[in-house]
């Protein structure tokens, strides 16, 4: 006698509805210029917290110095928040008023073409 598969039982694949995975929203971590935080400290933060190579850290620091703000990196919310808090903690420990903020990256449909 042949064993017949149960025709009433659906497979897991059949019972699942297709889920569309979306990329998480990304966040920009920004460093802001001030008159007291040294350029060397900003470079050190970019190298140690944001893992930037020395040349890139220097270029970002110069952007902060010249334009008043510079992009340290773009990350998921949790990573951005962790890097923001680490930067604030280091600035406080070294008695610098370095301002670091985060803002949501523009969604593709939000961008102007």
Question: Where do the model's predicted regions map?
Answer:
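Terminal domain-initiation and capping elements
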Residues: 1-113
């Amino acid at each position: 006698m042949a064993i017949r598969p149960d025709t009433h039982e659906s497979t897991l694949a059949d019972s699942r509805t297709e889920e569309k995975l979306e990329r998480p929203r990304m966040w920009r971590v920004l460093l802001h210029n001030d008159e007291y935080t040294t350029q060397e400290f900003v470079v050190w933060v970019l190298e140690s917290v944001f893992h930037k190579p020395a040349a890139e850290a220097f270029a970002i620091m110069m952007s902060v110095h010249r334009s008043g703000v510079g992009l340290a990196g773009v990350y998921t919310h949790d990573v951005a928040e962790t890097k923001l808090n680490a930067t604030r903690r280091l600035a406080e420990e070294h008695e610098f008023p370095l301002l670091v903020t985060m803002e949501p990256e523009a969604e593709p449909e939000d961008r102007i073409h």
